[in-house]
């Protein structure tokens, strides 16, 4: 699963997809104009952004307002993988997958009201850094950083590139490598040049365009199928002409229009959807660097909360503009989107296991008018870029702050900035090398396992964060062994999934009952419970962390005014070299050559000599960056809006249950 709580239906990469149409001049013009515009926004935001310090490059100088944060929370999570995967799963199984989107509202409120206040008062830039301050020592922080980077490279980047490539191939018939390399190049260019401010502004722009394009397509598609009543009738009949004898795989599910499904036989059982999914969603929305980094860049806590509420409202819509259009695509083109005969599917999309993933691109190609089609293609590219940009930026933050600083504790600010940029280039190279792996891997399994990987690897992390915030008695030994045991159990289940695989239509299911009968969302709950037991037992058997070390690191101490005594850290940087200080960069008397100036601008290094901050300035800056005080009026506005959001959310669950 991409580390976002959306399942994606399995479909291998198409081998040869013929161009379905030649692009009209208007379509090409729209794509070109759009990309020029995106680059311009990226460059404009980087010129006015504070890119010269680590805090500025990675946290947008803690100056963002609520609306770009809310839009960015949405678009970081709504990549092209979501469009293709969510629509494909909707086409294959109906509405239930939309519950993955609606669940996010609750967890986003938890992010703004519970997690972010603790992170801000703790004064942290990355999630592993919080764990280091909370527990001391390095092993948890390094474990978390390395695990996150592996998850990013193997799940997020590969999913996004796979989905983007699938979209380009189905809709344009372009060469896969050329289009992907161009996309990655443009993405890397403005991530490197702009840092997080460029990412957040371009994200906000992309969200607007994505949502408009998706809404236009939604109305065209609903009009074509006869609106919701027409969809109810046509989806029930949407079976392909060619079927596998003596099977029912080709028939639409009888519970397709219900979100809550049987707890034992359902493809997405309702207790798993409510409780198990919340475990995965808490990892994604409350402890994952990509998402939390957005909220930490807010100018104050009220802006972070309002961003969460806006993000929650925006997450209502994918059910209507992604999942339902996926179902409409099956209703309109059942022979292609719903194919089950392996040879027929191979002809249609180059994938024997089924073609439900082509549901969304198929709609774009068949239904969009000229010009709008170009816009939708641009939007899908934008979704891919937005996701990749977030991952590149957050991965380089993790690498520089948590891994590079371990290797070189005395690295200067300038060195950290350069290493962050170089690491992004390394990620781009890895991504391009990864493309043939995705093409040749059985991607039917790859996509199933991306969901599974999240349920097998994330519950222990979720558990550690929740317990660290709410229970001061949890110590480093408890957290570490909880993570380790959870990792081993999750890996055992994951390896079993790889070994046994999922049977296709007409095959008998020979998997052991642990795989066959325990849904991955149930497994997430079991793993959570196991990790809680291990953490509790080990923590109670070992010495507690003295309270002087926990000031402003737990929910109960977040408002404390006491001085926190940091836990011993053998790797700590020498005093005075933290984020807030800006080192003097000796400038030559002669102005550097133009190419050197351009290179320094690209890496966020200014030629002007900066003075070290005085002790008073440093304390004032630190106080501003760790303040969770709120204006009473805005606090009330945020609370009321959060209540309205959750009430609307409950109504929607009830209506479609």
Swiss-Prot record:
Q: What CDD domains does this protein's entry cite?
A: SLC5sbd_SGLT4 (cd11488)
Q: Which parts of the sequence lie on the Extracellular side of the lipid bilayer?
A: 1-24, 101-104, 169-180, 229-265, 329-373, 439-451, 500-520
Q: Which residues are glycosylated?
A: 246
Read off the Pfam families from this record: SSF (PF00474)
Q: Which GO terms describe its molecular function?
A: D-glucose:sodium symporter activity
Name the family: Belongs to the sodium:solute symporter (SSF) (TC 2.A.21) family.
Q: Say which domain of life the source belongs to.
A: Eukaryota
Which cellular component terms (GO) are annotated to the entry? plasma membrane
Looking at the keywords, is Cell inner membrane present? no
Compartments where located? Membrane
Q: What does this protein do?
A: Probable sodium-dependent sugar transporter.
Q: What is this protein called?
A: Sodium/glucose cotransporter 4
InterPro entries for the chain: Na/Glc_symporter_sf, Na/solute_symporter, Na/solute_symporter_CS
Q: Establish whether keyword Transmembrane is in the entry.
A: yes
Task: Give membrane topology per the record.
Answer: Multi-pass membrane protein
Main subcellular localisation? membrane
What residue ranges lie in the Cytoplasmic compartment? 46-79, 126-147, 202-207, 287-307, 397-417, 473-478, 542-636
